């Protein structure tokens, strides 16, 4: 059987779930006319993250890294090493092959598994990206027997465990447990409820430095600092863009 090309691997990954835009470093390796990208506004989120966190010289973990947009972009921004974790094998295999073709094997370490958030699993990591992962607890990973209330407590337990392992956390959480709109994590589905949940539930372990909120101007999406206006839920933006983006610093590391 012939070895699959990078394009083959990308197209295989695309069949399994929503995926990301290509990082700049990969655009020259994959022909733009042969791929279809379903963006999750990665560029807008990256711009906000980069405005708040300098990763130059840092070891970074990208948990639930999908097709690697943030991993490759943070390497381009000077991260010394990125540990990429992804339980989805097609996604992982694509990122591993792309890292090889770019000569980044020594800086981009790939792990085809889900993070369990146990003690010292991410020890030595300076900054962790945990973007839109934990609302899948009890589904893609974790105890499948959990009910929703127990899952919410486990989400906070995961964040508490991370505070002992990584200095900076970039965090997003979805509004619906397991991605199911019939199982909302919060009664009214508002940003205020989600922010209160994270703020109050992590107060012993994390300092929240900033919260970015998506705003739309024309066709452009940008993340701005939380204020009383953008705190309001915007149904026109859809559920994904209502998710706040937290920049957090550990009280223990």
Residue spans of the language-model regions?
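A short SAM/SAH-binding and catalytic strip from SAM-dependent methyltransferases
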Residues: 126-149
